Amino acid sequence: MPVRRYGGRYNNSSSGVSNALSSSSTAGLRPSPSSRENSTPLSTHHDPAFLSTNHAKNEGGLCQKHHVRFREPSVEVEVEIMDDEPSRGLQKPPSRARHAADANNNSASAQCNTTRTSDYTFYTNEDQKKVYEALRSLRPLPELQEPRRVKEYSEVSIKESLYRIVEAHDVIMVAGAFFGDEGKGKTVDAVAHHPLCTCIARVNSGENAGHTVYDKAGRKFVFNLAPSGLLLPGKRNYIGPECVMDPVSFMEKEIIQLISAGIDYHDRLFIGNVCIVTPYHKLLDLLGSAANSSTLKGMAPVHGSKVMKRGIRLDHIFNDDETLRKRLEKDMETYLGLLKVKNLSDADVVRLCREENSDGVLRVPDYVIAFAQAKEKVKFLMNLYHDRVRNNPDFPARCDVIYELRAAVLRGEKVLLEGPQSYWLSNARTKFWESTTSADTTAAGLLAASQLNFQQFKSVVLNVHKAPGSSRVGIGACPSSFVPQDFFSAQNIKTLHDLPPATCANFEAIQRTLFRDGFPYSNDKAKHNGIMAPVEYSDETGDYNIGVAMAIASAQHHGECGAVTKKPRVCGFFDCVLQHEVNSIQGPYLTISALDRGDEYDKVGVTIAYVYYNPEGKQVNVNGHVYKNGDIIRAGDPVPSESALYHCHPIVKLIDGWRDNPIAAAKRRRNTPLPRGLCELLSTIEYFTNCKVLSIGNGPNGDDIIYLRQ
């Protein structure tokens, strides 16, 4: 099992911690180091191929099985757990003495060797130490000393920077440059405020995207499909026909916010002929348990219906009932067939839905459960859509979105395409294909979905990244993450509230330990090779591998969790290897959000390369190139697929922080010189990715942006 810089154990005597972590539901998740002879230490994530051929040992030797689904905001993982009593919650991580004792429990464990499980630990295990010993002698790359010259950056006004770009183009796209959650909303808002930008559109993806926006009164709105410009008077907002929509959820979760706030949206929101996400698509998401059946929003199933030309679009709801009925009957065959294959009754499905909602989070809406209960399911759906959509006076106006966008550009207006998710979460990117969303969320995908003539209209992409604390959610490889992507899920940490309050709460001490002890030769150019040492951090709750401590502390301190789900995101270093490809495809402009976080760091880490290392010596063939131990993948080299990235480790360049010269909007006066550490960070990112940093975020407010002279 691939494992990397993570681990830690809670002290048994810690006040309140034992009770908080007393559930035995994850007892099979952390076998002893001696039982992981075939594991791959220090790799970032589960390798699916490995999961299918290796088995974990149950700590207690107990063989009663139950299934627990762990879902991240973008993907789902199903882990089969062996346990004596099914329950929810966290398991107290075993002590090292317990690990040693478990090595003698092989006979009982052998009876349960079909279990798929993760072998993650909270503390630093021996496997991780061995891999570090293999990598610590890696010769320092010359690139660690680059760039030789630190560029000086100066602040300019929005009119001198962003608005010049907007005015020179017809179509402006704001796109995620990493794995989503980069803070795109602030840039969207800045572009939308330009007087020539009259149209803001969401043109693909669906309810699985999300963003939080505020109006002038400071009221908070959480949207999924609704464009961010919806709160701006005089702007027209569109949801294009390549989007997928659950119209019932859209009305209940998004439009209701506008109605409650007294905002008249009828002259500023228009919906195209979107594909409809039905209740059975969401139930297929629940029952399928596939790697990309993500948030119970029905994304993969509805895109399947769309590609197969089954299902329904919004126009079907407003037209002939007989056609609507026949199409629903035909498309529902997939759902009914799955029930038959799995030997599930309607009552079984209802029970599973209620189990998903049992912790108080409404993951499966009431109308979806009502559909599962209904005897005449097609009739139920037709009545649902008649009442909630066709005959609902609050449902937004419909139009030909493609025509309206094209007409606006021809009139000399600017169109803003608001990108959901990101480049690397796009289903069109083969490198992370198995762990992506179901739409093409690259800038090219946005432009294609808008159907705006790229030969006739000038377009530009504003890429958005985030640092420090670049993050990804869901399974998949991400070499620069502090822990594997499914680490929190594997520990049954569904929200940050599942952690005892004092767990890794001292962010200041943890980041200091990381940069002081995790990179012991950071001040010696001849010895610093950028490989992070698996050191430990200790607090009143226990001992933690520094990667785990940083992952927990970053999620808590920076608020890196879902706006609604509160599921923690996995943070890590800014990744120049991945960013270089993004820039080469849809660059050069880059805006970096949340850089005021750097005010609290002794140093800031940037991944400038990877080193491939598999402890078993296995090679991986990707696109005809064979990756073997010791191979270096630099920024600008071809990015391999996840089969290789699972075994890649970041080579980190360290840059001095700027504690003495904070850039946070609340502490900095505009137009004051930018600190050298920040300038070195920006110079490093530009050097290794060939991008142009257009602006940086320095606070929570919409106008907390520092625009840079280009």
Curated annotation (Swiss-Prot):
The protein's organism comes out as: Leishmania braziliensis
Q: Which residues of the sequence carry a binding annotation for GTP?
A: 180-186, 210-212, 569, 697-699
Question: Cellular component terms, GO, for this chain's entry?
Answer: cytoplasm
Give the required cofactors.
Answer: Mg(2+)
Q: Which family does it belong to?
A: Belongs to the adenylosuccinate synthetase family.
What else does the entry mention about this protein? Parasitic protozoa lack the de novo purine biosynthesis pathway and rely exclusively on the salvage pathway for their purine nucleotide requirements.
Instruction: Return the protein name.
Output: Adenylosuccinate synthetase
EC main class here is ligase
| Transmembrane regions | none
